[in-house]
Regions:
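Active-site entrance/lid segments in N-terminal catalytic domains of soluble metabolic enzymes
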Residues: 1, 6-16, 20-21, 25, ...
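Glycine-rich beta-to-alpha transition loops that act as phosphate-gripper elements at the mouths
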Residues: 41-44, 291-293, 333-346
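Ferredoxin-type iron-sulfur electron-transfer modules and their immediate structural context
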Residues: 370, 374-375, 380-460
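Catalytic cores of alpha/beta
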Residues: 48-54, 211-215, 327, 340-359
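Glycine-rich phosphate-binding active-site loops on the catalytic face of alpha/beta enzymes
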Residues: 58-72, 229-231, 348-378
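Short beta-strand/loop segments at the ligand-binding rim of alpha/beta enzyme cores
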Residues: 32-38, 282-285, 327-337, 446
Length: 460
């Protein structure tokens, strides 16, 4: 990281660093937060280098990839590959982390340590201006299993874990490599990594099980807690009509999950009970809106019978769930958002009082993590403070989404960005601009040379 940054000004290929305005930080879960956006639990939060790249680009709230009892090769064998396609709206058939749970924990702790030192070394923000959020699933028995329980306990208080001590010792041994980070800075890195959790459950999980998981994590573990909700809370008719009206009539789904998943009339009293329990313990409680949406594989999009929709087509459903809850809870139920959030809608989401906001699909598109710098730059205003959710604003977001050119399916399909050539096994990305150019100009190299001021080389 240090060598690449010194040579190119980049970190893991991320070209533009986001520098936080320390006068505009906010707070959540009793801790500082320099901005309320970051990557959602998924492919962008599985490895330490994912977390470093996202932070450098502007992320400050990290929803770590979900851990569960099934892990490693056992889990990998259940996931058909490829498992993600994101040409316009996105689909996936992936699951939780494919690492063993202890390996996942090590990656998260390594990332935690790395973010602390690069924040000061590169002048990106405060050493404690970001937060990690655990995502766990999928049933109470699995969460109580020894390896997941160890994960939860260690992520709360990692000071005595071998990986934390190893990382700290390594940094202290190499403190001479840093120009700004001191031994005192390294010694000051807190081992209290996570104090919040997002509960992820499988489709069809009974409401009683969801409530038991939440009660356990709140009362036994003391976590600030979010429950991830599904778009199926809207009901089949609303979801089908919305998709049809917006040009997504080709997306196939039946009413099974709408009947099998948590029902809205069961969700409301459950959420009220959990709000009361958290208030008694001075903990924050809320919902995560939303999970991905199960649809049928119809055009061989992925090697699976069912896949999970996200991105631009999920947004009108997710923001409708948020609006419904904002209205029925008088704006008092906290909502963490992930469901098609991107550059075009995130200001409105946060302005309505919905945050933190995490993203996956938009970062899968060309630009990748660099998109986070653009998104974080939108939010350089006064630090947001949660005073409730404005249901009038969420209602407006719902109506705007139905006609927004950024969410309605285009009549003319987007051209494929794929090429017919065999790509290399390693470094397999080939710039589509180069392939699309009639003379195959090396556009990316040209841009890099111009940025470096090497104009004559760029013209060769």
């Amino acid at each position: 990281i240090l060598a690449e940054h010194k040579a190119t000004g980049q970190v893991f290929g991320i070209q533009k660093a986001y520098v936080a305005d320390l006068e505009k930080t906010t707070e959540i879960f009793g801790r500082k937060l320099e901005n309320p956006v970051g990557p959602a639990a998924g492919p962008h939060t599985q490895l330490a280098q994912n977390l470093v790249a996202a932070y450098y680009a502007g992320a400050r709230f990290f929803e770590l990839k979900t851990v569960q009892k099934m892990d490693g090769p056992e889990l990998s064998a259940c996931i058909p590959k490829p498992c993600i396609v994101a040409e316009d709206e996105a689909y996936n058939c992936e699951w939780s982390t494919e690492l063993y749970v202890p390996q996942a924990m090590e990656e998260y702790i390594k990332g935690w340590m790395a973010l602390h030192v690069i924040s000061k070394e590169f002048g990106l923000g405060s050493m404690d201006g970001f937060q990690f959020n655990i995502s766990v699933g999928y049933d109470l028995a699995g969460i109580k299993s020894e390896k997941v329980d160890t994960f939860l306990n260690t992520m709360q208080h990692a000071q005595d874990s071998e990986i934390f001590k190893h990382c700290k010792a390594y940094l202290l041994e190499h403190v001479d490599l840093f120009e700004k980070v001191t031994a005192e800075d390294i010694e000051s890195i807190s081992g209290d990594i996570c104090n919040s959790v997002t509960i992820s459950t499988l489709h069809g999980c009974p409401p009683e099980e969801i409530e038991k998981i939440a009660m356990y994590l709140i009362t036994e573990k003391g976590f600030h807690t979010f429950i991830k909700c599904n778009p199926t809370l809207l009901g089949y008719e609303y979801a089908r009509k919305t998709m049809d009206d917006m040009g997504y009539d080709y997306i196939a789904f039946g009413d099974f999950h709408f009947k099998d998943d948590l029902q809205y009339e069961d969700a409301v009293p459950m959420l009220n009970r959990l709000i009361a329990v958290c208030q008694e313990r001075n903990l924050e409680f809320g919902v995560k809106i939303t999970n991905t949406f199960p649809v049928d594989v119809k055009q061989n999009e992925l090697p699976s019978e069912e896949m999970y929709m996200s991105g631009k087509s999920l947004y009108p459903l997710s923001i409708s769930v948020a609006n419904m809850l904002a209205r029925d809870f008088g704006g008092k139920l906290r909502i963490s958002y992930s469901g098609g959030a991107d550059f075009h809608n995130i200001e409105g989401i946060i302005d309505a009082g919905i945050w933190p906001v995490t993203m996956a699909t938009t970062i899968l598109k060309p630009g990748g993590y660099d998109r986070l710098c653009q998104i974080a730059g939108l939010l350089e205003k006064e630090g947001v403070v949660f005073t409730g959710i404005d249901a009038a604003k969420t209602e407006k977001l719902v109506e705007e989404a139905k006609t927004s050119p950024y969410h309605v399916k285009a009549v003319k399909p987007l051209p494929s960005r794929k090429i017919n050539k065999q790509v290399p096994l390693i470094d397999c990305f080939i710039a589509p601009c180069k392939e699309g150019c009639p003379i195959h100009q090396d556009i990316t190299t040209y841009l890099q040379l111009v940025e470096a001021g090497k104009y004559e080389e760029a013209m060769d």
